């Protein structure tokens, strides 16, 4: 089992699939919009488009819905022998996700397999372009409307300079096995308050 949180399949994802095939049938979880906004960023395509994209990857046996950033519920449901992920989840806030998956899979004798993370300048550039696309005003308005429908509480931070903007954008906090981050930032421009989601 592995899980994808992406709008675009790149070499790193294909590497995970290739490595996972060595252990048997590959089941891929696709995070729902609700889970994705808690984990990484707002999706640029719908859950169903992401699911279809993953289903079309050679080597994927089955695609399942993952409705949480934590893996325990889906692991208990499908009981994979292995949970395979890039080793980027071994440190930082993502470590809580790994620990959650490890506890769930080891409860019945399964194993975690950490694959060396694929560092590629093209992947970094792709990520930068996706974030730039999400920064366009028409996407921000659309995202805010969607976010208000997905999240019971939208967390925003008032930003008044570049540093506080980066804090709002980059901060991810792990607390008691859960990850959290800001959903939006309030920007005060010449007495006009703007919400950027």
Annotate each predicted stretch with a short phrase.
Residues 131-173:
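N-terminal amphipathic alpha-helix/helix-capping segment at the start of soluble metabolic enzymes
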Residues 23, 152-154, 182:
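A general structural motif
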Residues 1-137:
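Nucleotidyltransferase catalytic core that binds NTPs
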